[in-house]
Amino acid sequence: MAMLVTNLSSSSFCFFSSPHLQNQKEIRSGVRVRKYVIFNRASLRTVSDCVDSITTFDRSVTDANTQLRRFCESGNLENAVKLLCVSGKWDIDPRTLCSVLQLCADSKSLKDGKEVDNFIRGNGFVIDSNLGSKLSLMYTNCGDLKEASRVFDEVKIEKALFWNILMNELAKSGDFSGSIGLFKKMMSSGVEMDSYTFSCVSKSFSSLRSVHGGEQLHGFILKSGFGERNSVGNSLVAFYLKNQRVDSARKVFDEMTERDVISWNSIINGYVSNGLAEKGLSVFVQMLVSGIEIDLATIVSVFAGCADSRLISLGRAVHSIGVKACFSREDRFCNTLLDMYSKCGDLDSAKAVFREMSDRSVVSYTSMIAGYAREGLAGEAVKLFEEMEEEGISPDVYTVTAVLNCCARYRLLDEGKRVHEWIKENDLGFDIFVSNALMDMYAKCGSMQEAELVFSEMRVKDIISWNTIIGGYSKNCYANEALSLFNLLLEEKRFSPDERTVACVLPACASLSAFDKGREIHGYIMRNGYFSDRHVANSLVDMYAKCGALLLAHMLFDDIASKDLVSWTVMIAGYGMHGFGKEAIALFNQMRQAGIEADEISFVSLLYACSHSGLVDEGWRFFNIMRHECKIEPTVEHYACIVDMLARTGDLIKAYRFIENMPIPPDATIWGALLCGCRIHHDVKLAEKVAEKVFELEPENTGYYVLMANIYAEAEKWEQVKRLRKRIGQRGLRKNPGCSWIEIKGRVNIFVAGDSSNPETENIEAFLRKVRARMIEEGYSPLTKYALIDAEEMEKEEALCGHSEKLAMALGIISSGHGKIIRVTKNLRVCGDCHEMAKFMSKLTRREIVLRDSNRFHQFKDGHCSCRGFW
């Protein structure tokens, strides 16, 4: 009391001067004192003042409530909560509690909010709709959505606003199912909904990709009479577009009685995002005609549409509109404009926009780097990346992946390594997107050791990481490593191989002729429904064709619902490899009748088929069709096919003259095709002339030296063989050893000439001796010229018995059941003696043998070969 008297005697309480002291009774009763003590803001600044005042005089409900509201109005949450906690239940009005809860919600103070909630529940307050609404709002704003939902379970909240807020916050936190569940509860509670309710819940259906749920919501909206509301219509348009239901979105848009700029922007952006840029741009034109004022979002979407459809003229017109509308200083405008020009191939305009930007961001640099990369200016892209730090702009993940993709595309290994060093220095190496891009760069540059190192150091891997490393090994001819990693992926069971994985590993099966493994993967594809992916289907057809199962390949080809050019080309190439030129031509004609235009690659496959089937006239005809009807300029590959075709059929001089008259300089591939023809037809003199041209073009290619040495050996010109082998040694070159492999019970067995490492060596040698004896009985004489050694005939015969393809075929026959097809692959051209023995083996054992060499397939059956001598 003494402290209070002291306070009252201070200058701030001058109302106690004599003019005011008229009624001592009123003063004693404390009515006026209480009134001025509670209401004077200047004096009572702390909760302790309020508590002293309230406890000193007769308390009334109005006292605490009024001061609490004062605290709430001034934002003094700390004192409001303290005062509330020392107040009794009967002092506080529920409306005051609502004010305090609102302050907690606005301040996002969960701790204070929980204290208020405890006060409410501890004092037995009835939580009605109003108080429950504020409680749920407090918990929602403070991020405790679980408690907010609990309040909704306990109390019937009647105002849609609070339902909408919680629904929206649940969706923002990623709990889309919870948001939809709250909407369903709102329906069952009979709460009157508003437009915002439907906008909130449609976003959740959209995020869950729940098309069926969204369609049901659409029906409910129409029944509820909200279908004509602009905001609801915009939400439905956005829902359908996000779920790729473009036609449904357009229908909603067309039925909207009132459209705003958001409506138009949504449908334009939706078309562009779903790969229908031209339709989006058409809507933009309608928007202009309708007199709707465009905004920055409109222009950004239109730039993206122009970029996708390469409509640079429209892009320039919109550029002018944007400048007039004063958008040219907006980052989004400049960045999308720059991207549009670079994607349309107008790099000069893109550079002009880039130079004029006053505030270049990392997005600007990334767009410019991607533009340089698209135009093949890889050096400029890398240079710009290196300049970024000089300008004080740190590249982000997107910039780094863009420049790595550029290095990968143009095989810039040294530049890629420099970027890798920068990544290490800036601790970006553990980002999964960067690591995947690094692996891809190294793999495409043929540096699989570095790619494997990046893969092994990754802390977190995803399926893209596995696909990149498996695909890298497969494309760089490390088929065994690709299959091993694929098996490891299956064993780990952390990720399931997807469409991309199987498309990456199937070429490895094809390379090894691993028919059984390929068939296992085929089963996996069918079980998981991946065959509908055209890339997978094409890879599967290619795998079976390269494993010698041409009939199965064609059956799968027929099953492809929508064949593209790759599908047809793969099958044509398959027939060509097997020597079925007429079938390849028939398929090519079928393709053209189906309205699919041939390209350079499909013509290479067709000309190859003609070459390996001896169809010279047809080969010339299609070569001319390609040039004159299809307007395709022949490349080195096309000319090489024609030279090979002429050389195989023995027209070596014509082939030589054809090369001399070519409009482009011949490379080693073309001269090499003629050199192979010289070997087939034993023309040593022309071979010497051709070989010098090949050696000049590719002096480090051992294969051509070996080919010429073999030509000399077959002609028994041993001195020339010695000189050539000495030349190889002087250059420090190494001969690529011939090897063959065969898959037995899921294991690939590899043989080199004279190999005795296989556990079945004794049985293999015994079988080959038996076959050779039977062949000699039937009048066969070993073709010892293919032994390629200067020795006695007996030694030559023994050398022939040790050829790798013979060893592989023998293992296949003695290790597999009767009737099983033998599939062997050799890295070099099969020799003539092995070819003859394979024919005899197929007849003797009544087994089909499929031998794939570096040139083509040989299918041996009943003593005959499918090549018919064209090999």
Curated annotation (Swiss-Prot):
Subcellular location(s) of the protein: Plastid, Chloroplast
Co-factor requirement: Zn(2+)
Keyword field contains Chloroplast: yes
UniProt protein name: Pentatricopeptide repeat-containing protein DOT4, chloroplastic
Keywords recorded for this protein, A-Z: Chloroplast, Metal-binding, mRNA processing, Plastid, Repeat, RNA-binding, Transit peptide, Zinc
One GO biological process term: cotyledon vascular tissue pattern formation
Organism expressing this protein natively: Arabidopsis thaliana (Mouse-ear cress)
Chain segments carrying region Type DYW motif: 777-871
Residue intervals passing through the bilayer: none
